[in-house]
């Protein structure tokens, strides 16, 4: 397969420059006959989750296609679902560069991107042009300059704008790179946010005559008590699903490696066990009442199967996709 050669060339570049170059090429071919260059035939393995039928259980995690620029090209690679975003109400540049780092020996990434995106209106225009026949999730967040106490307003603005175009909506309250964002995972702040989101979802269902499920994305760094509280809140508010997990602040498995001390969220193989354990514990709390989308360090069929064995209904990849490329999609979907 050609990807090892592509990866070797891309890894000569700064990680963010490599990402920009790749997306530049994907933008050129998306929606054109040249999409055939990245198209892969994968088996159909339908899975029902959150009331939706996914053509296979593998999705692309949020963060790679923040603005929905390459939906068709990425979809052609065989994903059953794509989660685009995180998108915010207004465009924002994100944190200062450099802000994305490879831990090559660990097959991990550290990012402190900070929700850089072109805004929700731009994303919606891109979604309108796409022809992806899988499930499209749209991951939403708050602007950096929106005070945390007003954060729910940003989520409601985004919900209103994406509702008509989303297969499901993901609520990102677990990125470590937006100051104060993770506090929305706890106690009254979480209850307040989920109440507002559920009310908005009900209102939008009436307006659009369709029900779009909402999933909440959580951090892997929650302690046992916090995880129990989150599970309880999600169930009480009738949230449709939970995405476990986002990136971690834990560096215990990458000590001494190049870039390990960079601030930001760590993803990839070093996150694999931690996220699987969160899924296992969450599954025990939820008792099958709420589906789990498992993400974190999936870089093989075995890693994907471990997430499902722990309690996930669907799985997503990101860092594994960077390190292994499109062949990983076919491998996982074929053998999962």
Swiss-Prot record:
UniProt binding sites for FMN: 62-66, 86, 139, 172, 217, 245, 268, 297, 318-319
Say yes or no: keyword Oxidoreductase present: yes
> Where does the record place it?
Cell membrane
What binding partners and quaternary form does the record give? Answer: Monomer.
Q: Which gene encodes it?
A: pyrD
Needed co-factor(s): FMN
The protein's name: Dihydroorotate dehydrogenase (quinone)
What reaction(s) does this enzyme catalyze?
A: (S)-dihydroorotate + a quinone = orotate + a quinol
Could you name the active-site residues?
175 (nucleophile)
The biological processes this protein is annotated with in GO are: 'de novo' pyrimidine nucleobase biosynthetic process; 'de novo' UMP biosynthetic process
Describe which pathway this protein belongs to, using the record's wording. Pyrimidine metabolism; UMP biosynthesis via de novo pathway; orotate from (S)-dihydroorotate (quinone route): step 1/1
Query: What GO molecular functions are on record for this protein?
Result: dihydroorotate dehydrogenase (quinone) activity
Q: Which organism is it from?
A: Salmonella typhi
The protein's topology relative to the membrane is:
Peripheral membrane protein
List the transmembrane segments: none
InterPro entries with a match to the protein in the record: Aldolase_TIM, DHO_dehydrogenase, Dihydroorotate_DH_1_2, Dihydroorotate_DH_2, Dihydroorotate_DH_cat, Dihydroorotate_DH_CS
GO CC terms of this entry? cytoplasm; plasma membrane
């Amino acid at each position: 397969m050609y990807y090892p050669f592509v990866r070797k060339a891309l890894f000569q570049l700064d990680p963010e420059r490599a990402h920009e170059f790749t997306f530049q090429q994907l933008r050129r071919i998306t929606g054109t006959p040249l999409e055939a260059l990245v198209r892969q035939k994968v088996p159909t393995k339908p899975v029902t989750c959150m009331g939706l039928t996914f053509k296979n259980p593998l999705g692309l995690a949020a963060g790679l296609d923040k603005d929905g620029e390459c939906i068709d090209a990425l979809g052609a690679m065989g994903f059953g679902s794509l989660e685009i975003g995180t998108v915010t109400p207004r465009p924002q540049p994100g944190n200062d560069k450099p802000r994305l780092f490879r831990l090559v020996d660990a097959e991990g990434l550290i990012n402190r991107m900070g929700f850089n995106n072109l805004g929700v209106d731009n994303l919606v225009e891109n979604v309108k042009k796409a022809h992806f026949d899988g499930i499209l999730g749209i991951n939403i967040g708050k602007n950096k300059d929106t005070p945390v106490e007003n954060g729910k307003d940003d989520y409601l603005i985004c919900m209103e704008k994406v509702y008509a175009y989303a297969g499901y909506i993901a609520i990102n309250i677990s990125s470590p790179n937006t100051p104060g964002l993770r506090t929305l995972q706890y106690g009254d702040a979480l209850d307040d946010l989920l109440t507002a989101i559920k009310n908005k979802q009900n209102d939008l269902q009436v307006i659009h005559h369709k029900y779009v499920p909402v999933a909440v994305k959580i951090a892997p760094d929650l302690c046992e008590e916090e995880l129990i509280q989150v599970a309880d809140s999600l169930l009480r508010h009738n949230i449709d699903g939970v995405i476990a997990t986002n990136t971690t602040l834990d560096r215990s498995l990458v000590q001494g490696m190049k870039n390990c001390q960079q601030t930001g969220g760590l993803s990839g193989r070093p996150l694999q066990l931690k996220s699987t354990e969160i899924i296992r514990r969450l599954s025990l709390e939820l008792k099958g009442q709420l589906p789990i989308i498992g993400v974190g360090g999936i870089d093989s069929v075995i890693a994907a199967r471990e997430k499902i064995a722990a309690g996930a209904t669907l799985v997503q990849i990101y860092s594994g996709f960077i390190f292994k490329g499109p062949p990983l999609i076919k491998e996982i979907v074929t053998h999962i």
